[in-house]
């Protein structure tokens, strides 16, 4: 082939490739236009509705590639309608307790940045359950951990984190600032309340949906405080128990009814309960029950029964002869429904809980009657109403060779069961005052939930070796 023929051949080949490329481009353009018309005519694709709560949103992303072909991605997302929680279901039958979560915060904190906390609890919402606690604004290994035995300081905050993890500066969310707290989800959004300030003039800030909604000043000038575990909501109404006044004498307790963070009604405590602190509340059958701490007199626990629809309440004492506060005397022959049963030393009380459901009633208490060590669950039928009621079943949660602490109730009200399954947590306190070789006071958490099966006991103690912190 001579040079002229080669040139003609190469030119012809180039022109052929150019024509083919042009035809491919025209075909792609036509296909892209056709796809756009088809998307516009499809009845299943809706215009985004930003005002509705039960809408379909369509997002069309046109991405231009290097070969000038437009690729259309269609993403459809549905937003579920948010509704207020209603406490219409009964409690589930419980024959024993199964492990739900254990964060091992102190063990992990020996070699990691774990926050110093106390007064922990769990609380659930439509998206799942989270752990909560009052942080001390420092880590276990931090120098500021010295002095964290004290309850109230400007450095404390209510934090929350994913259930099962240990709280660190990297995985926690600050809910509000303060040294006493409660928090609950109404089905639409979360309400959190924190108390802060000096003992003689503390105040509460109520947060709803991540924003401050209400402020409450002290009404007795003596450590305004609240539940230290979750509140409970019914049809948007969230009652919260608050106390202001002496810890060892008559104090001023109020039940405050909130809706979307705003006060709907305030009631002074009525009934036979003489002292109320640190209530543990749960809801079922449209009623909220709060089992509290009488820090003044009673080793039997006060019970507040709340009607959230009428926004009214009554109070009394747990009738059972099984005493559940610490310190406490030996269990008496008879309980008392209307008056505190005195006795026990040296500690005046500890936060605790119970589930009161006729034959399906369970009480929690420390195994030691004198100190915050060990923890057990006792099934006590009719504990709320019978002065003769005693245990028919028993399960060890923490053995008596290990420290416990506060305990409280919570329920995952969104678990789609035909009933509300009771759950509880136990605070496992480590450090001072019992273990003075370290400078800090902190805790880990263990949580369990009810089971219809009859499961065995095991000790879910903290497990950290304090000697490793020296």
UniProtKB/Swiss-Prot annotation:
Q: Which InterPro entries match?
A: Glyco_hydro_34 (IPR001860), Sialidase_sf (IPR036278)
Q: How does it assemble?
A: Homotetramer.
> According to the UniProt topology, which residue ranges lie Virion surface?
28-470
GO MF annotations, alphabetized:
exo-alpha-sialidase activity; metal ion binding
Explain the post-translational modification: N-glycosylated.
Q: How does it sit in the membrane?
A: Single-pass type II membrane protein
Q: Catalytic residues per the record?
A: 151, 406
Q: Name one Pfam family in it.
A: Neur
Q: Which UniProt keywords apply?
A: Calcium, Disulfide bond, Glycoprotein, Glycosidase, Host cell membrane, Host membrane, Hydrolase, Membrane, Metal-binding, Signal-anchor, Transmembrane, Transmembrane helix, Virion
SUPFAM superfamilies assigned to the protein according to its UniProt record, in alphabetical order: Sialidases
Q: Which domain of life is it from?
A: Viruses
* Disulfide-bonded cysteines: 92-419, 124-129, 184-231, 233-238, 279-292, 281-290, 319-337, 423-449
Its protein name is: Neuraminidase
Q: Where is this region: Involved in apical transport and lipid raft association?
A: 11-33
Positions annotated with a glycan in the UniProt record: 51, 54, 62, 67, 70, 86, 146, 201, 402
Note down the stretches annotated as region Hypervariable stalk region.
36-88
The listed locations are: Virion membrane; Host apical cell membrane
What is the enzyme's class at the highest EC level?
Answer: hydrolase
Q: What is known of its domains?
A: Intact N-terminus is essential for virion morphogenesis. Possesses two apical sorting signals, one in the ectodomain, which is likely to be a glycan, and the other in the transmembrane domain. The transmembrane domain also plays a role in lipid raft association.
Biological role stated in the UniProt entry: Catalyzes the removal of terminal sialic acid residues from viral and cellular glycoconjugates. Cleaves off the terminal sialic acids on the glycosylated HA during virus budding to facilitate virus release. Additionally helps virus spread through the circulation by further removing sialic acids from the cell surface. These cleavages prevent self-aggregation and ensure the efficient spread of the progeny virus from cell to cell. Otherwise, infection would be limited to one round of replication.
Annotated source species = Influenza A virus (strain A/Duck/New Zealand/31/1976 H4N6)
**What catalytic reaction does the record list?**
Hydrolysis of alpha-(2->3)-, alpha-(2->6)-, alpha-(2->8)- glycosidic linkages of terminal sialic acid residues in oligosaccharides, glycoproteins, glycolipids, colominic acid and synthetic substrates
């Amino acid at each position: 082939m001579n040079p002229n023929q080669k040139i003609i051949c190469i030119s012809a080949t180039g022109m052929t490739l150019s024509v083919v490329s042009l035809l491919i481009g025209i075909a792609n353009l036509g296909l892209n236009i056709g796809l756009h018309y088809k998307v516009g005519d499809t009845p299943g694709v809706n215009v985004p509705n930003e005002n509705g709560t039960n809408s379909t949103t369509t997002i069309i992303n046109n991405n231009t590639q290097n070969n000038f072909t437009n690729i259309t991605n269609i993403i459809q997302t549905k937003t579920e309608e948010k509704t207020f929680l209603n406490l219409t279901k009964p409690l589930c039958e419980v024959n024993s307790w199964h492990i739900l979560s254990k964060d091992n915060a102190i063990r992990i904190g020996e070699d990691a940045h774990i926050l110093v906390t106390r007064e922990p609890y769990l609380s659930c919402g439509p998206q799942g359950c989270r752990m909560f606690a009052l942080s001390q604004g420092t880590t276990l290994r931090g120098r500021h951990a010295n002095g964290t035995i004290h309850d109230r300081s400007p450095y404390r905050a209510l934090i929350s984190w994913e259930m099962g993890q240990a709280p660190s500066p990297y995985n926690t969310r600050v809910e509000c600032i303060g040294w006493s707290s409660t928090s609950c989800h109404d089905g639409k959004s979360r309400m959190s309340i924190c108390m802060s300030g000096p003992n003689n003039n503390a105040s509460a800030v109520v947060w709803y949906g991540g924003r401050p909604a209400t402020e409450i000043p002290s009404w007795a000038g003596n450590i305004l405080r609240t539940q230290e575990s979750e509140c409970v909501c019914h049809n948007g109404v969230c009652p919260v128990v608050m106390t202001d006044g002496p810890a060892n004498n008559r104090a001023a307790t109020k039940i405050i009814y909130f809706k979307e963070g705003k006060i709907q009604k305030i009631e002074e405590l009525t009934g036979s309960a003489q002292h109320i602190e640190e209530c543990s509340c749960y809801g079922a059958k449209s009623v909220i029950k709060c089992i509290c701490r009488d820090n003044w007199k009673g080793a039997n626990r006060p019970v507040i029964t709340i009607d959230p629809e009428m926004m009214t309440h009554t109070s009394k004492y747990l009738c059972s002869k099984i005493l559940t506060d610490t310190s406490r005397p030996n269990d008496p022959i008879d309980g008392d429904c209307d008056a505190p049963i005195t006795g026990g030393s040296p500690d005046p009380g500890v936060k605790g809980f119970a589930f009161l459901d006729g034959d399906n009633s369970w009480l929690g208490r420390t195994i030691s009657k004198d100190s915050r060590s060990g923890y057990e669950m006792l099934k006590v039928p009719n504990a709320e109403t019978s002065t003769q009621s005693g245990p028919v079943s028993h399960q060890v949660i923490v053995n008596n060779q290990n420290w416990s602490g506060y305990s409280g109730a919570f329920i995952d009200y969104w678990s789609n069961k035909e009933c509300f399954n009771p759950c509880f947590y136990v605070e496992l306190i480590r450090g001072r005052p019992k273990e003075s070789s370290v400078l800090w006071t902190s805790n880990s958490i263990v949580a369990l939930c009810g089971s219809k099966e009859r499961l065995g006991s095991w000790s879910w103690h903290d497990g950290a070796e304090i000697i490793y912190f020296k």
